[in-house]
């Protein structure tokens, strides 16, 4: 009898190894209940429904209000420019020193008045709640949720504190001069040291004892639809100084202000807002939050505490989405997937699975190659089997079910990334690859023939007529598979890790099902693996 036939016979003696008796198969280790889906699946989309009656109202009001408001805004900007010029004349380009004396007093007073006048001319009715803290009480304002470019109204209400802005914005004619008048912290996208310099500048200003203006930061770093608070970036919390949370609400029947990655454009929102009779906005200044010693040393802890307080006051949940999710959304769209397919809650994924953005982006390319043929950008069991070049079998369904965390019959990108990291990568170690190769190499000649490859997979998957020629040719450079080819393929395709280790589980189950005296008998086959040694290596559990 050939070694391949012997291997198949051994697998066949395992309880439940036969087709149709999968209930007795050694079950794949169940995953831990973790990585719960976020309470808000996509905070970066806004779909405002405008009825026919409302459309007629917008058109009628727009005929009168739109040109008037555009002219008023332009006039106010022109009036503000001379004050901004007086404030910034002879100031160094990098704003190394604060604007002081009469220039600061006159220009701040004039610009605050003109700022309020501009938002009033746009139709905004502003309600202010709470007490604004002094620079000594709270050097930093943190405003959320950040949902629109109109959120600049918080800066006007707070007394024109400094803001963090891109360096390119300061070069825009007219607008750039007005921006420089509030002494912003400028961030450069081309300077590799920009992040470090920005943090150092924030620390310098917030610890100046009131010499510099207060700083207003939108810690979310991007706009959302106000349905939740996403991850707060730690920049505003690194100095370890007291901060004052600022809540922003837009309690209007028709939302014409929300500016997200999927929704109305800048021009469309301006036109819709200007065509409203009025737009309500509430700016609430919460009590100052003073960090304790632990929070001073851990800005992420301080940021999370402040975020939770703000979310509780707003009555909305928090999620671990961040700006990197927006970048993944754009990448998903470029790969012809639905944009929302790229959402993974990047903060949680990167922290728990130790993945950086480049790693997740690489997985998105892999995911797109599988899901591009399906509707909705999700992987079904058929696409899963086609990608693995294997038929739909009971073992494959078990593996698919482990990826499918919410049991909806499909795998989304978030589930795919978690599955690779938690289920496949722990089983894809050098040791496991070596053991798997030895099991496939039945005659122990250092190479796997197509007959050996087919026999072991047929036995482990319980599919006696399995055709693996396509998969074999993808791995092998010639008529057989060397260890280097096997290892290279396993590392590039961690999805196969569970398939390759299924046969190990079968052998383990077989050994433990034998009488004790047989279990203790030394095996003469050099390519058998010890159950005790393998017990840990096949686990797909991972602490969260």
Swiss-Prot record:
Q: How does it sit in the membrane?
A: Single-pass type II membrane protein
Biological process GO terms, please?
A: membrane organization; phosphatidylcholine acyl-chain remodeling; platelet activating factor biosynthetic process
Its GO CC terms?
endoplasmic reticulum; endoplasmic reticulum membrane; Golgi membrane; Golgi stack; lipid droplet; plasma membrane
State which Enzyme Commission number(s) the record gives: 2.3.1.23, 2.3.1.51, 2.3.1.25, 2.3.1.67
Q: Which domain of life is it from?
A: Eukaryota
List the molecular function annotations (GO) for this entry: 1-acylglycerol-3-phosphate O-acyltransferase activity; 1-acylglycerophosphocholine O-acyltransferase activity; 1-alkylglycerophosphocholine O-acetyltransferase activity; 2-acylglycerol-3-phosphate O-acyltransferase activity; calcium ion binding; lysophosphatidic acid acyltransferase activity; plasmalogen synthase activity
Segments in the Cytoplasmic topological domain: 1-57
Q: Which residues lie on this side of the membrane: Lumenal?
A: 79-544
Compositional bias per record (Polar residues), positions renumbered to this chain:
518-529
Task: Cite the record's Basic and acidic residues compositional bias ranges.
Answer: 530-544
The cross-references to InterPro entries, in alphabetical order and at most eight, read: EF-hand-dom_pair, EF_Hand_1_Ca_BS, EF_hand_dom, LPCAT1-like, Plipid/glycerol_acylTrfase
- The answer, when asked if S-adenosyl-L-methionine is one of the entry's keywords, is no
Q: What is its main location?
A: endoplasmic reticulum
Kindly list the positions annotated as binding Ca(2+) 1: 404, 406, 408, 410, 415
Keywords assigned: Acyltransferase, Calcium, Cell membrane, Endoplasmic reticulum, Golgi apparatus, Lipid biosynthesis, Lipid droplet, Lipid metabolism, Membrane, Metal-binding, Phospholipid biosynthesis, Phospholipid metabolism, Repeat, Signal-anchor, Transferase, Transmembrane, Transmembrane helix
Q: Where is this motif: HXXXXD motif?
A: 146-151
Q: Report the SMART domains cross-referenced here.
A: EFh, PlsC
**Sequence motif EGTC motif, location on chain:** 220-223
Q: Which reaction does it catalyse?
A: a 1-acyl-sn-glycero-3-phosphocholine + an acyl-CoA = a 1,2-diacyl-sn-glycero-3-phosphocholine + CoA; a 1-O-alkyl-sn-glycero-3-phosphocholine + acetyl-CoA = a 1-O-alkyl-2-acetyl-sn-glycero-3-phosphocholine + CoA; a 1-acyl-sn-glycero-3-phosphate + an acyl-CoA = a 1,2-diacyl-sn-glycero-3-phosphate + CoA; a 1-O-(1Z-alkenyl)-sn-glycero-3-phosphocholine + an acyl-CoA = a 1-O-(1Z-alkenyl)-2-acyl-sn-glycero-3-phosphocholine + CoA
Membrane-crossing residue ranges in chain numbering: 58-78
Tell me the function of this protein. Exhibits both acyltransferase and acetyltransferase activities. Catalyzes the conversion of lysophosphatidylcholine (1-acyl-sn-glycero-3-phosphocholine or LPC) into phosphatidylcholine (1,2-diacyl-sn-glycero-3-phosphocholine or PC). Catalyzes the conversion 1-acyl-sn-glycerol-3-phosphate (lysophosphatidic acid or LPA) into 1,2-diacyl-sn-glycerol-3-phosphate (phosphatidic acid or PA) by incorporating an acyl moiety at the sn-2 position of the glycerol backbone.
Please state what the annotation says regarding this protein's domains: The HXXXXD motif is essential for acyltransferase activity.
Its name, as the record gives it, is Lysophosphatidylcholine acyltransferase 2
Species the sequence originates in: Homo sapiens
């Amino acid at each position: 009898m050939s070694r391949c036939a012997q291997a198949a016979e051994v697998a066949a003696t395992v309880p439940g190894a036969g087709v149709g008796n999968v209930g007795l198969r050694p079950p794949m280790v169940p995953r831990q209940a973790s990585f719960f889906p976020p309470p808000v699946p996509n905070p970066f989309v806004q779909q405002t429904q405008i009825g026919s009656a409302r459309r007629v109202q917008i058109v009628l009001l727009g005929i009168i209000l739109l040109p008037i408001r555009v002219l008023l805004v332009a006039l106010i900007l022109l009036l503000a420019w001379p004050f901004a010029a007086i404030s910034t004349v002879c100031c160094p380009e990098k704003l190394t020193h604060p604007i002081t004396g009469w220039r600061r007093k006159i220009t701040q007073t004039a610009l605050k008045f003109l700022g309020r006048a501009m938002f009033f001319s746009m139709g905004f009715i502003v309600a202010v709640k709470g007490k604004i803290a002094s620079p000594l009480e709270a050097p930093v304002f943190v405003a959320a949720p950040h949902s629109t470019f109109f959120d600049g109204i918080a800066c006007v209400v707070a007394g024109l504190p400094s803001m963090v802005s891109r360096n390119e914005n300061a070069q825009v004619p007219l607008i750039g001069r007005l921006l420089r008048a509030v002494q912003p912290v400028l961030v450069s996208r081309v300077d590799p040291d920009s992040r470090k310099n920005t943090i150092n500048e924030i620390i310098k200003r917030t610890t100046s004892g009131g010499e510099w203006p207060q700083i207003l930061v939108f810690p979310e770093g991007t706009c959302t639809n106000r349905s939740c608070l996403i991850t707060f970036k730690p920049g505003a919390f690194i100095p370890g100084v007291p901060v004052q949370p600022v809540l922003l609400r837009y309690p209007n029947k028709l939302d014409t202000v929300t500016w997200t990655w999927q929704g109305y454009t800048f021009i469309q929102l301006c036109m819709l807002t200007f065509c409203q009779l009025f737009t309500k906005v509430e700016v609430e200044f919460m009590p100052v939050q003073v960090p304790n010693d632990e929070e001073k040393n851990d800005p992420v802890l301080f940021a999370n505490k402040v975020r939770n307080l703000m979310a509780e006051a707003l009555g909305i949940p928090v999620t671990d989405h961040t700006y990197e999710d927006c970048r993944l959304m754009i990448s998903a769209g470029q790969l012809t997937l639905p944009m929302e397919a790229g959402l993974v809650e990047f903060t949680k994924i990167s922290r728990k699975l130790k993945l950086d953005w480049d790693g997740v982006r690489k997985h998105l390319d892999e995911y797109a190659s599988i899901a591009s043929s399906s509707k909705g950008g999700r992987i079904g069991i058929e696409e899963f089997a086609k990608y693995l070049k294997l038929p739909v079998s009971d073992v494959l369904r078990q593996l698919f079910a482990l990826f499918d965390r919410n049991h909806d019959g499909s795998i989304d990108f978030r589930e795919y990334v978690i599955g690779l990291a938690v289920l496949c990568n722990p089983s894809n170690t050098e040791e496991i690859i070596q053991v798997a190769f030895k099991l496939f190499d039945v005659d122990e000649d250092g190479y796997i023939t197509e007959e050996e490859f087919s026999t072991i997979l047929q036995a482990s998957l319980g599919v006696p007529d399995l055709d693996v020629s396509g998969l074999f040719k993808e791995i092998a450079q010639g008529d057989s598979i060397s260890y280097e080819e096997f290892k290279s393929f396993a590392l590039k395709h961690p999805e196969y890790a569970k398939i390759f280790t299924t046969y190990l589980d079968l052998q383990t189950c077989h050994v433990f099902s034998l009488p004790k005296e047989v279990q203790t008998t030394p095996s003469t086959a050099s390519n058998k693996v010890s159950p005790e040694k393998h017990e840990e290596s096949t686990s797909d559990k991972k602490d969260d």
